[in-house]
Amino acid sequence: SDDSKVVATGYGRVAVDFADHVITEITCHARGGREMAGDECAIIDVGGQDTKIILVSGGMVQDFQMNDKCSAGTGKFLEIMANRLGVTLQELFDMADKGTVLPISSLCTVFAESEVINYIGEGQKREDIAAGVVDSVANKVAQLAMKKNLPETVILTGGLSNSTYFTKILSQKLGQTVSPTE
């Protein structure tokens, strides 16, 4: 017999009308965190649409925090900025690793993009612009995470967990090791 089931989660979960179960993204992250790291951990999920900090204690969701509806602290922001620089997301991280941070002070994607355009117009090094862009997202994620009392084990999920550079920068900002998912 086939014991397989379909579970839908995330923003598109309501569109999967054939799902056997619908489970919130936060609950799924907590279950994954528990499997990876045990009953006490924090999950930082930097997705395309939002950023979530999920605290797991006793194997259950203890608390969570989401960013506001602005995309400036998300993967989408980095995609937009990489596109503006004419590079892929991976190339953006590679460039950032070689650059010196140029500050991106705007909290809004549209205004931050204007800052990037101005830097390009000034002839600033693309590596420095890339470093500023990645640093900006890491700052926003760290500020959200530091609103919570993070346990020793912190896991990074979402597309940015594929970037060793972003993981390194976020770890520095939090003052503790952040482990990417495998």
What are these regions (language model features)?
Residues 1-7, 50-52, 81:
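Conserved phosphate-binding loops in N-terminal lobes of ATP-dependent enzymes
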Residues 19, 23-27, 170-182:
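Conserved phosphate-binding/catalytic loops in two-lobed NTP-binding clefts
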Residues 12-44, 49, 54-59, 142, ...:
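Conserved phosphate-binding catalytic cores of ATP/NTP-utilizing and phosphoryl-transfer enzymes
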Residues 58-104, 108:
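Glycine-rich phosphate-binding loop plus the immediately following alpha-helix
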Residues 31, 75-79, 179-182:
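Glycine-rich phosphate-binding/hydrolytic loop that grips phosphoryl groups
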Residues 60, 125, 146-153, 173-178:
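Short, surface-exposed connector motifs at secondary-structure boundaries
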Residues 11-12, 150-173, 181-182:
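Glycine-rich phosphate-binding loops at beta-strand->alpha-helix junctions
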Residues 112-146, 150:
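Adenine-nucleotide phosphate-binding core of ATP-dependent small-molecule kinases
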